[in-house]
Amino acid sequence: MNRFDRDVLNQSGARYLIVFEGVNDIGGVSDANAPTLTTNLINAYTTFAGTAKARGMRAYGATITPFGGNGYYTSARETVRQSVNNWFRTNTIYDGVIDFDAAVRDPVTLTNFQAAFFPGVNANDWLHLNPAGYKAMADAIDLNLFTP
């Protein structure tokens, strides 16, 4: 929230917003505070969309990618990710959703990346994909979302 004005709203000519945030927030929360974080993230995402749309921008939400295997993975944090992703997929605040989670997750172990996208650029962190994974994310974006 702190950088939203500078990084988004104050950019001249910006017409579109893709909100792809959250995994670092999730990793930093205690399991006890995870339910509160879900609410806080959804409130922030709602503010982002409303503010951007009030400025005439189109706003798209992007699901949070898996982080199973990372040192800060817990089932409580995974519940936050799944709850936020479900909200993105079903909300009516955004103009659309870009499902990065579906594009890169393993079809059997839904908490992890597909094996083809690992190791990532930061070796074994289970957060950063390799180039094939980032290409899958790019391919998940429907470019028709950006036609006037």
What name fits each language-model region?
Residues 38-69, 73-81:
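C-terminal structural cap/anchor segments
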Residues 1-46, 68-73, 128:
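Conserved SGNH/GDSL esterase-like catalytic core that processes O-acyl groups on lipids
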Residues 12-17, 53-60, 92-96:
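Loop/turn elements at helix/coil->beta-strand transitions in domains of secreted/extracellular proteins
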